[in-house]
Regions:
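N-terminal catalytic or cofactor-binding beta/alpha core of small enzyme domains
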Residues: 1-190
Length: 190
């Protein structure tokens, strides 16, 4: 998909906050932030998953499409996602996990990002919960240093691309959330 806008500055000139999109932020003072930069109707259920993972323990940020239709025009590629509130929250975080959606019903979470230790820990926890994972899909590598998930204090993070069938299954959402939480707890306490 080709983005309609090249960055947030361009998007905000043409789209109206609280009419076309909204921004949800919870800063609980954690060193970990969970983000859904394509939430709401842009990539359905990603906001719900991010908030489910964050609970009241981790910070979260969700950029959510709320238009009646054509929410895809609000999509900013992750390496162009520069909304200032997201940048501020993430820049103060040691660990960043971005929740994304991919098409298809493969029953798979595709992991990307530059934080290899956290990515491997999340992958292990997902597999323990019976969730299929892939760490090598060419479309979901998340290695661009400008990717929003790689903009934390340590300049590395993780992104999860979750297939539609998993996002539509409440039980699977719970398992994915538990797996990410368990991985974060292990990494934070190491």
């Amino acid at each position: 998909m080709t983005d309609t806008y090249k960055n947030y500055g361009e998007l905000k000139v043409h789209e109206e906050i609280e009419k076309d999109y909204k921004i949800s932020i919870s800063n609980v003072g954690s060193q970990t932030t969970i983000i859904a930069p394509h939430g709401g109707k842009i990539e359905p259920r990603t906001s719900d998953i991010a908030k489910h993972i964050a609970t009241e323990k981790y910070n979260y940020y969700c950029f959510e499409g709320i238009k009646e239709e054509d929410n895809g025009c609000l999509h900013l590629t992750s390496h162009n996602f520069d909304e200032p509130n997201a940048a501020k929250l993430i820049s103060g975080s040691d660990f960043v996990v971005a929740i994304h959606a991919c098409t298809g019903n493969s029953g798979t979470v595709y992991l990307g990002g530059t934080d290899q230790i956290l990515k491997n820990s999340i992958a292990d926890e997902l597999e323990t919960k019976g969730i299929n994972i892939s760490k090598d899909h060419p479309r979901f590598k998340g290695l661009n240093p400008n990717n929003i998930c790689n903009q934390g204090k340590r300049k590395k993070g993780v992104q999860l691309e979750i297939s539609r069938d998993l996002r539509d299954d409440r039980e699977k959402i719970g398992l994915i959330s538990e797996a990410v939480q368990a991985a974060l707890e292990k990494i934070e306490s190491a």
